Amino acid sequence: MTSDWDEIKRLAADFQKAQLSTSLQRLSERNCVEVVSLLIEKGLLEVIFTTDGKEYLTQAHLAQEVKDELFVQGGRVNLVDLAKTLNVDFDRVQRVAEQVVQEDPSVKFVLGQLLDVSYFERVAMEVNEKLAQAGEINVADLTMQYDLPADFILSNIVLKYLNKIIMGKQDASNANIFFTQSYVTRSKAKIRGALAAITKPTPVSAILAQCGIPDRLFNMLVNEVATLGSVTSRSPGAQYIPHIYRKTQVDWVQNFYRQNGYLEHDSVAGLGVTDVKNFITNQLPEAKIIHLKKCSVGEKLIDQVVASLEECLSSNTYLDVSTILPSIMTDEDIDQLLSMVLTAAMQKQTLIFGSTILTTKFVDDIIKPCYGIAEEHAKRSVDSGSYQQYMAEKLMKHQDPMDRDSAVGEGKADKREERRKKAAGGKGGGGTQGRETKTKSTKKHVRGQKGNVSDSDDDMPSGGKKGGKDAVIELITTKEIAKVLEAGLEPEGLEDLSKQLAQHYYPQFSKLALAKAHQLYEISLHQSNQNRRQTHASLQDKLNNLYNDIRLYEKGIKLFPADVQPQLVKYLLKSLGTDFSNEICFYVAAECNLNSNGTTLTVEQRNKIVQECSQEYKSALQALNKAVFSSASIDDFLDVAESALQACSMILKKIDKKKDRNLILCHKHGLLEQLANCSDPALVLHLAVLIIFTICTQSMLHASGRHVSSILSFLQPQLSPEQAQTLTSYHDLVLKLLSAEGSSSNVDDITKQLEDLTPTVKSIASSFKKSGVTSAE
């Protein structure tokens, strides 16, 4: 190992000697490469190859070349450019640059660049020159100019050379701003001059634009120079307000308030005041101010309003508040002021419409006629039936159907029970001999149920079925109320308030009219119930009489031959059967609130009543109408008639034979009385044969004139030959008279003969006595 090291030393010495030798004997390039390669292999020599591999250099030599290049480039060099210039790999250059920075503190490595102190000093001189020219400089601008970080420039250049090379001052509020004292002095003078010339509130932005001063510098200096005014804030929209202007504002506000007792917000805002209400409060601390929307009023004006209100209440008149308040006050301001001024007692005695205050006593005197109108209309609605219809619709709308049916059914059952008791203890075969028919347990149709309704919608249940429109009745209109009010307000010049007052009083009078209508309705209902009971009893008697008449007439019809009976039955049902059916239909129509005008009903009218009536009447009434025209016998009709009476809760009285004999006797006397007063030949003959038939058979007969010949044929056995001849001749003359009406000569002759025979015919009928007993029994 020692021998090797000695050999290396010898070779190195030879190599050095050869290099220093001036001799022409030099090593060849190949030998040099071999020697260097051997040294590198042995670790005795460290070299750096160039990028093209043709040259190599040592680490120290590369460091020296980097320093030399930094100097040549003026103290700032980029490593990328340096690597190209030195023809050395970038990584090698970067490592050497880092080594140089470590060895020399004056050299800085920033963003891939090497910078030395000479560069810093040169930049500092440039910054100082620029600062002297502009008066102000920002590190951010230097960053853009020199392409270096702001913090690096600030710490290594600006602050390092401040007051050495860079003659300036750092801004206390912004460390990146530097300015010269002369610049500050000039700016302060500009600001002082501009503010001194301002006499009204001016935006700070306008001042800055005029002076050309940054807002930052203005905010820093304004407190030092603004001795004649103040800046509202440091925001972009700030204003400068001179003290002279603020004094003018305060003087104007105080003087105006002292003279008028109020302040308009728009006028105060026009003085440049932003927060008007606080400004007024601050400038008038001792005054009791009420802030409204458009203005602020003082105690003096409020006292004036209160005094006027008290005078108005004491005199029972009205007050237009706008006449004592400033014209600039809006309706909203007036409402707000009155709500503060009016006490609870005052509010009960007044009505307020806009700016007009009316006392209730003043309005009551004017509106008195409306009470009479409401009562009159209520009476008219009850008399016309419109109120009853309204109550029925209202009940149908709000009451549950099951409750309505059960309630109505119970009411109907009570009425039937009352009628049965009355009939059972009343006239015409009543008492223990009365025949009571069973009534069907059916629900009655829904009608007004007038005893269970209220005069106010508020009392109706709200849980009823909904759908459709609610029942409505208007007993008094706003126009009628307004007309009355207008007549009373017109002398005072307040007719414009009539419609508003009418709207205010309409619910009151509408409720009053409904209450009055309900009161009258209850009275009429009580009277109607009494009349209904009386009518029901009288109709029951009338229908019983018709029923008995038809039954008694049937006995007379049964005495005739079978071929004649159908004609007589048809005529009896068409006349008395129709009367019976009409009476039943009239009753049902009244019970179901159906329209049935007139004293008689046609077939169509009866059928219409059947279709529209309640279900409990429909089947019985339909069968009755059909039986009038289609019954084969009187018994069939009487069965249907009995069912109809039962459906109408009427009692069919028990047959009384003694009463039947009295009825037949009365019927005969009635016919005799008609005969005595009759002069028409055809009617004389008709009455005569009916009287003779009644006397012969002790039965009644209901027949028309066309049945006289059949009755005469039936009576032939009961008549003497002379009587039969006389009646036959009289009958023939009547037929001739009816057929010879066109020939006046024949009519006169026949009429003369009839006049001669009429007394004889009347005598036969009035003096006739039966020769034997022929009875329907």
Swiss-Prot record:
Say yes or no: keyword Transport present. no
Which GO molecular function terms does the record list? UFM1 ligase activity
The answer to whether UniProt assigns keyword Transferase to this entry is yes
Any signal peptide, and if so, which residues? none
EC numbers on record:
2.3.2.-
- Disulfide connectivity for this sequence is none
Report the enzyme's class at the first EC level. Answer: transferase
Q: Which GO terms describe its biological process?
A: protein K69-linked ufmylation; regulation of proteasomal ubiquitin-dependent protein catabolic process; response to endoplasmic reticulum stress
**Region entry Disordered, spans:** 396-470
Which Gene Ontology cellular component terms are annotated? endoplasmic reticulum membrane
List, as start-end ranges, the regions of compositional bias called Basic and acidic residues. 396-417
Which keywords does the record carry?
Transferase, Ubl conjugation pathway
Known role: E3 UFM1-protein ligase that mediates ufmylation of target proteins.
Give the family this protein belongs to, as stated in its UniProt record: Belongs to the UFL1 family.
- Name the record gives this protein: E3 UFM1-protein ligase 1 homolog
Question: Which source organism?
Answer: Aedes aegypti
